[in-house]
A protein has these predicted regions:
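Hydrophobic or amphipathic alpha-helical targeting/insertion segments
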Residues: 75-80, 84-87, 91-107
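C-terminal non-catalytic interaction/assembly regions of soluble proteins
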Residues: 294-436
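An acidic, phosphate/nucleotide-engaging active-site surface
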Residues: 119-174
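N-terminal glycine-rich anion-binding loops that anchor highly charged ligand groups
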Residues: 27-45, 68-73
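Gly/Ser/Thr-rich loops at beta-strand to alpha-helix junctions
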Residues: 12-14, 39-41, 82-92, 176-182, ...
Length: 436
């Protein structure tokens, strides 16, 4: 085999792609179709709750097109990180969609289902053997962390996909997986240079993200050869350039030249990018450095508590000029009132109040380089986190009332400072999670 052709319909199953682009990609005779279906990008809630980031209907639409296309061409379909987080419940949800489509479309195929969720007993065993260590700058990892986790998954590399392909799988639905591994598996097992396979996979896993100006989620096509690979989006309106492809290595990476995978590191130091047509780019020189020890990244999510949120705006210029002092005084007043209401039943460490000020530094917090407030209004998002939803809601009610009437020296009499667009003013978010 001198060339392997790959079609990536979109960067996330459920985010959509153009049917016209997909049909054009199919007409170029791919050897397989691959699609990433998850990520840690949406946050820990999906791993913690077992829910997907995209609606079931959206995922089913994308899966139907991909399944029908793959079976029409009789080529494998590879899906990784099922239903966002890739735990067992996510995997089962996507498999059920696949089975529904197969029944509705009267499709028959050999399917491999690859699990990624890790049991607490297994993790504790490996921890005791010294086989687990925290990734910098993660905090200490111990049995307590394992016990607090709602779900823990291991991010698999290319090998499980390779094994399934060798066993004759025509459709592969995998739990949490390296996005890139989905696309690197078949080229590597067919003897193509690992550097080129992994680099092409890094671009393909985001669909059409490596074009100059992506208008919507869409397809990307790659031709991997022995000394280079070529990228071109099937949509004739989309253009790949050396800059658009090279700059994609900055996406989601601290180091744009060294990208770490389970089995080694993709090294782009000597990669070259060449415009070979108006819309296509040729890439060569990428290398893959095998790891001394194979590693699997663990991802876990634990429940922090329950949360209620208050959204309010402030437009008084006297108020805006002293917003930092006012929010500090508000927190003091709120904590004092919570103590009055709950006494020893609710200590300061049991709950948390956080205030984000949009129009000042709501996005970047203390990292915001612009210190002067020039806007005529501010938006405050006040988060209350507590052990239960009832407690979070109750404390949010306290915060709302304290914020409405907390005075500044320039005021005379009772004046309302905070304008809340919703009634009730607080929104209950339910359980919230963090990666651990």
């Amino acid at each position: 085999m001198d060339e392997i052709r790959i079609l990536a319909p979109t960067g996330a199953c459920g985010s959509g792609f153009l049917e016209s682009s997909f049909e054009k990609g199919l007409s170029q005779a791919p050897h397989f179709i691959g699609c990433d279906a998850g990520s840690t990008d949406p946050g820990p809630a999906y791993l913690g709750t077992g829910k997907p980031a995209f609606p079931r209907e959206a995922v089913k639409r994308d899966m139907r097109l991909m399944l029908k296309g793959a079976r029409r061409l009789k080529v494998p379909l590879l899906i990784g990180s099922a239903n966002t987080a890739g735990g067992d419940v996510h995997l089962a949800g996507l498999v059920s969609i696949v089975r529904e489509i197969a029944a509705e479309e009267k499709l028959s195929f050999r399917m491999a289902v690859i699990h990624a969720e890790q049991s607490k007993a297994y993790l504790k065993k490996r921890l005791g053997e010294g086989r687990i260590k925290p990734l910098h700058p993660a905090p200490e990892f111990n049995e307590a962390v394992i016990d607090r986790s709602e779900c823990t998954v291991g991010m698999m590399g290319a090998e499980p996909f390779m094994h399934a392909l060798k066993e004759g799988a025509e459709v592969i639905i995998a739990g949490r997986a390296s996005d890139t591994a989905i696309f690197a598996a078949m080229p590597v097992m067919n003897g193509f240079p690992e550097g080129l396979a992994w680099h092409a996979g890094k671009v393909l896993e985001c669909g059409a993200a490596a074009v100059v100006n992506r208008k919507t989620g869409d397809c990307m096509f790659a031709w991997i050869r022995k000394d280079h690979f070529v990228l071109e989006a099937p949509d004739p309106e989309l253009q790949c350039t050396p800059q658009s492809v090279a700059s994609h290595s900055l996406y989601e990476n601290a180091d744009p030249f060294k990208l770490v995978e389970c089995s080694g590191t993709l090294d782009l130091t000597n990669s070259t990018y060449e415009q070979i047509s108006e819309r296509a780019v040729k890439v060569s020189g990428s290398e893959f450095i095998p790891a001394e020890r194979y590693t699997v990244k663990l991802e876990g999510a634990e429940k922090v508590g329950y949360q209620s949120v208050i959204i309010g705006s402030i437009r008084d210029p006297f108020f805006i000029r002293q917003i930092d002092d006012w929010t500090e005084r508000l927190l003091v007043r709120c904590h004092a009132r919570v103590k009055q209401v709950y006494g020893e039943r609710m200590k300061p460490g049991d709950y948390h109040i956080n205030i984000r000020i949009y129009g000042k530094n709501g996005t970047m917090g203390p990292l915001e380089p612009v210190k002067e407030i020039t806007t005529h209004e501010l938006c405050l998002i006040i988060e209350v986190t507590a052990p239960s939803q009832d407690e979070a809601s109750s404390i949010a009610g306290i915060v709302r009332h304290q914020g409405l009437h907390l005075p500044i020296p320039e005021w005379s009499g009772l004046i309302t400072a905070l304008a809340c667009p919703y009634n009730p003013a607080h929104l209950d978010r339910g359980p919230i999670f963090r990666f651990n």
